[in-house]
């Protein structure tokens, strides 16, 4: 056991043991940063950090723009895009999304990307949540919005190398089939979880526990 760890008793109601270190003892401070690779989609840095206890290390950080996912709901159906993903060499069915311009309001990006990819213009936009795509590597965030009161403009504005099919499927079918071969994008799972919380799916079965900062009190 690390000397800073605190062993807590078993919680008989939820049945787990946790080794707890106060947040202030977990923090590392950045002391240096060096750009080692620039790409069209993100920059790679070598970042030097020092922990409170004196440990030091070099860590790789990917700096990318803010990302957007737009859940578009149209009369009980999700508006989805199906496209080729070059890294996985596979077709995926997912929610529309894109990249924010520097300083751009994420809600503006979410509405714009939806219209560009699907032709649907939203009447209302609701922010469902913001998450880190992978805090171990990426420094940016993913903003997730729900678009409703949709109007089909009949016009799309795809990038030169984009070739996208637009499909509409029942909400329940998409939720049921997530994590199948067709629905493999992890961001879609996060977006679905936030959507289900917003709509109140199964909230009566969720157990709420004490905030971690109150555990030692």
Segments from the language model and where they lie:
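Extreme N-terminal tail/first-helix region
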Residues: 13-38
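Acidic, metal-coordinating catalytic segment for phosphate/diphosphate chemistry
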Residues: 32-69, 74
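Unchanged
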Residues: 57, 64-69, 74, 98-187, ...
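Glycine/small-residue-rich phosphate/adenosyl-binding loop
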Residues: 73-75, 80-82
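A conserved beta-turn-beta hairpin within the catalytic core of GNAT-like acetyltransferases
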Residues: 87-93
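Charged phosphate-binding loop/patch that engages nucleotide di/tri-phosphates or the phosphate backbone
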Residues: 190-208
């Amino acid at each position: 056991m690390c000397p800073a760890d605190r062993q807590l008793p078993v919680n008989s109601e939820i049945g787990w043991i946790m080794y707890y270190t106060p947040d202030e003892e977990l923090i590392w401070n950045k002391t240096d940063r060096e750009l080692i690779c620039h790409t069209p989609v993100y920059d790679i840095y070598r970042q030097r950090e020092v922990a409170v206890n004196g440990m030091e290390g070099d860590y790789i950080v990917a700096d990318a723009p803010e990302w957007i996912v737009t859940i578009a709901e149209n009369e009980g159906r999700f508006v989805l895009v199906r496209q080729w993903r070059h890294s996985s060499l596979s077709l995926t069915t997912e929610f529309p999304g894109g990249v924010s311009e520097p300083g751009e309001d994420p809600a503006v990006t979410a509405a714009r990307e939806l219209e560009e990819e699907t032709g649907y213009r939203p009447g209302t936009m609701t922010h469902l949540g913001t998450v880190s795509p992978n805090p171990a590597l990426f420094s940016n965030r993913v903003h997730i919005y729900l678009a409703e009161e949709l109007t089909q403009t009949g016009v799309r504005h795809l990038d030169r190398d984009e070739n996208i099919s637009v499909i509409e499927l029942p909400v329940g079918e998409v939720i049921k089939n997530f994590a199948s071969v067709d629905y493999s994008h992890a961001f879609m799972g996060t977006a679905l979880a936030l959507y289900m919380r917003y709509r109140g799916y199964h909230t009566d079965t969720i157990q709420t526990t004490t905030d971690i900062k109150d555990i030692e009190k």
